[in-house]
Amino acid sequence: MCIRDRLGIATKPVVIGAYTMLKLCRFTGEKKAEDFIGDLTAAYQELLKECQKQQIAWVQFDEPALVRDMDAQDVELFHCLYDAVLQEKGNCRVLVQTYFGDVRDVYQDLTAMDFDGIGLDFLEGKETVRLIEAYGFPADKILFAGLVNGKNIWKNHYEKTLQTVKGLQEKNISVVFSTSCSLLHVPYTLKHETKLPKECSAYFAFAEEKLTELQELGAVSYTHLR
């Protein structure tokens, strides 16, 4: 029996991506990142095979290192890793998630690869909108749009966010509304902050409130922007 049936949970594993993993490693002696490509891709391939056995629909690989400056050698390394890993995705759909910036140095390569979803930061990713306008976004992929700030405690500026959403919808891009990064950076909820003055808390949105913002933005965009 798979995990989904045994626990009644349709989980989505979130794993540090292979490229970011290598970029965080320190190499000693004569070893370098390229020497570990084979072993690392084999490990990620096994992970995807196990996810297929467990009937997992989506697997998320976090690749924040993609927002850093990348040269041709870095882009080639990314290709070497994922061209191999994605061969074993089978029925699993793979989301590559980026955050804390934009992917200007690898956008065209990223969108051409066999990912099913691509997560982009629309807040700290200053070039994200321009990249989509300049190069488009593939019709066969889902854009996980980081529209609600996952790092700070402030409420979302709905009007500004909905303008971004409208631009994406006009391009007929399949969009999932998301936070710009994990919500581990913010407090859990405002519900128990009973000692905060209302004139202050009125401007705050913690983790639970940010999820509500995503729901509200989705409802408004579906109702009024179509």
Q: Where do the language-model regions lie?
A:
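N-terminal small/glycine-rich loop or linker at the start of catalytic domains
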Residues: 7-33, 183
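Structural preference for beta-strand elements that scaffold enzyme active sites
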Residues: 10-12, 57-60, 93-95, 117, ...
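Active-site beta-loop-alpha junctions enriched in small/polar residues
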Residues: 16-20, 64-66, 97-103, 123-125, ...
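Flexible inter-domain linker/hinge segments
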Residues: 202-216, 220-226
